[in-house]
Regions:
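Gram-negative host-targeted secretion-system effectors, predominantly Type III and Type IV
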Residues: 1-168
Length: 169
């Protein structure tokens, strides 16, 4: 199965168990881990001369889809909230995405397994680029106000009432 086609399962394992959705949960967890590893590889392979190639983000999003990439990045930033090398903007953005705690039998949060372990400064740069990429995609998809007006029908004549019988005096 292609990783991009696996739905992002946002709920913890106990919820998945109670609702008979363990297969969805497990598939999503595997995809999250693979996405985390792909992000680390993309950063490693695309960082040269103090610059992160913009293709790094596109490459991972093409493989996993923007929802999963952003979920993994939000989880990473939330878990590294203490790190001052991650920008305030990215920390504020990460808080807008729900990532439920998912404790195992020993109390360890399973979300720790898909935290990106690249240098925090590079991770921050990747998050910023990913957010910018999504904003650009949304801007391209959203028609401008002028385009919307051009698409509207030009029938501006007043509608006649059903009770209208002709010109009144």
């Amino acid at each position: 199965m292609i990783m991009k086609d696996i739905a992002v399962y946002r709920y913890p394992s106990n919820y998945a168990h109670e609702h008979g959705e363990l297969e969805l949960y497990r598939a999503s967890q595997k995809a999250n881990l693979a996405c985390k590893e792909a992000i680390e590889a993309a950063i490693r392979e695309n960082y040269r001369d103090n610059c992160l190639n913009t293709d790094a983000v596109k490459q991972v999003m093409a493989q996993f889809g923007q929802e999963r990439v952003m979920y993994v990045l939000a989880n990473t930033v939330q878990r590294k909230d203490w790190d001052c090398r991650i920008s305030r903007d990215n920390k504020a953005w990460a808080k807008t995405i729900s990532v439920f705690d998912d404790p195992d039998a020993q109390g360890t949060d399973r979300n720790c397994y898909f935290v990106v372990n690249s240098h925090p400064g590079l991770t921050d740069l990747f998050v910023t680029r990913a957010r910018k990429e999504i904003a650009e995609q949304e801007k391209e998809q959203r028609p401008s106000a002028i385009e919307k007006l051009k698409q509207q029908p030009k029938n501006n004549s007043p509608k006649l009432s059903a009770n209208f019988k002709g010109q009144e005096r």
